[in-house]
């Protein structure tokens, strides 16, 4: 009789259709089932267990609401949750296409520590040679942040900002203890401010990088299933 525990599901949350499209068209060799429709789309991709990709919609309220609703499903009880998509870089020297691995996510309601940060950094560096990977706190906002406001957020120690990661992870841990992480791709930065995704080189570069991250997410998922020594 097989006494191994059931695989822990993985929930990958992104906000925008273009982010979901990048995930859908990436991940060669990992499978791409079930990513054609809005909302939550399930596919048994990874060795770690079943994987669901959720497009939450834009903004912290939509993200937290969507994640909480999905995690209420018994099939996703205890699911590991990874927030991904695009972000604005806050640190000087960042460029579109750089990667950000959160050590923690923050918003006015609280801070959530991420799991497996070092593994994610190592896997991204290995699978995407030449891409810069930044680590540090990722802060949440309820609006697009531009200009001087970015400097204020940088002064708090944050290295990037987006509207969904903090809400996604806070909503996830409020539904029960679970591994969580956030990996974002810089779409604009202090010296490379973007007006609209997809209209300039920075948006295209970020899209291409996001297409390439799924294998790293699956490796993180597999790793968080391993027993602690």
Describe these PLM feature segments.
Residues 191-229:
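His/Asp/Glu-rich mid-to-C-terminal helical/loop segments that flank catalytic regions of hydrolases
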């Amino acid at each position: 009789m097989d006494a191994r525990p059931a695989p822990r599901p993985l929930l990958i949350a992104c906000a925008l259709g273009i982010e979901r499209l990048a995930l859908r068209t990436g991940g060669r060799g990992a499978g791409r089932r079930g990513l054609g429709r809005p909302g939550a789309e399930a596919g048994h991709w990874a060795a770690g267990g079943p994987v669901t990709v959720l497009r939450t919609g834009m903004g912290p309220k939509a993200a937290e609401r969507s994640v909480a609703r999905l995690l209420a499903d018994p099939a996703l009880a205890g699911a590991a949750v990874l927030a991904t998509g695009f972000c604005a870089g806050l640190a000087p020297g960042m460029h579109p296409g750089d990667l950000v691995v959160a050590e923690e996510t923050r918003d006015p309601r609280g801070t959530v520590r991420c799991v497996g940060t070092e593994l994610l950094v190592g896997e991204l560096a290995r699978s995407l040679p030449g891409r810069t990977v930044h680590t540090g706190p990722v802060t949440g906002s309820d609006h697009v942040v531009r200009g001087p406001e970015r400097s204020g957020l940088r002064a708090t120690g944050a290295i990037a900002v987006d509207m969904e990661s903090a809400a996604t992870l806070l909503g996830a841990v409020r539904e029960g203890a679970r591994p969580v992480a956030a990996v974002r791709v810089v779409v604009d930065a202090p010296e490379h401010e973007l007006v609209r995704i997809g209209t300039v080189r920075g948006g295209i570069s970020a899209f291409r990088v996001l297409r390439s991250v799924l294998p790293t997410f699956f490796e993180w998922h597999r790793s968080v299933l391993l027993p602690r020594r």
